[in-house]
Amino acid sequence: SMRRMVAYCSSLQTLNVSGWDTSNVTDMSEAFAGCRMLEELDVSSFDTARVENFFGTFSGLEFVTALDVGHFDTSAATNMDSMFDGNFSLTTLDVSGFNTAHVQNLNRMFTNCQNLTELDVSGFDTSNVTTMDNMFEGCNMLAELNLSGWNIEKVESMRYMFSGDNHLESIGVDPAAFGRGNTEGM
């Protein structure tokens, strides 16, 4: 487990994790959460094939502008709640290859990622997701999201999903998929 490994090291500015063996890690919850002064975090060598819990893994990294998570194997993941919550300075984030087939919780995944101008979540498999409250809340630089392929049949709550997203012009939603009553409070 890497649960809260270096969490809340609020004055830490640099951290070299390039040699870390993460191949047997199943829990990365809040591993780097609250390391708000951290300016760079290179997780490009992380093996995440066994990780089930990504709750708050990178939450509160206020000054990190890029996270190389494009190679992450998320096929075992069930929880991505608050994974990138509060990453105010993040300008690029490639999650287009994330396997979300087993994920149940997407709450606050990108909340307050206020400098992201693009985010490709079109390939997310949401067929097992039950909750996505506040998922994109405060991502006020995003102009569009493509959610047209999302299956939300099991979703019970989507409250404030797009709250504060003032520039969001298109969410590419299939009205038939999103018109089931579980969209209350969006």
Protein language model regions, located:
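Negatively charged
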Residues: 1-186
